[in-house]
Amino acid sequence: MDKVIAHIDQNQKRYQDEFFALLRIPSVSADPAHKGDCRKAAEWTKKKLESMGMTARIHETPGHPLVYGEWLKAPGKPTILFYGHYDVQPPDPLELWTSPPFEPTVRDGSVYARGSADDKGQFLANVLGVEAWLQANGSAPANVKFLIE
């Protein structure tokens, strides 16, 4: 575990940059004007999973695409499924925001942006945790699957 924690410490700036890049995508699923942004968020997620050595693909749905990724290189071990969503709610009313909703801002040690907690932050924390484990150890103690919609 020490190697994983050291890896996380060494990569904090990159993790923040990746998080902020995802937060800048205005993937508002309830607004048809943002359909392309939802696709962009799905493609961003697929690319991230692939960069970790996972097999990933986008599945088309009647609504917005979902992303499925897997790392199945731990034969005989359990499989962990992580679920999350890249879409966000509309940021209205805009006048209640202290900073632009799709421009991440750090105040008092917290990140403020639409989706920072629900749910881009949550699912990306899982993704980056798995990435840290894989990069620090070369493998994982379980098979891993992600379903992000």
Where are these regions (language model features)?
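Histidine/acidic-residue-rich, glycine-tolerant segments that coordinate divalent metal ions
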Residues: 141-149
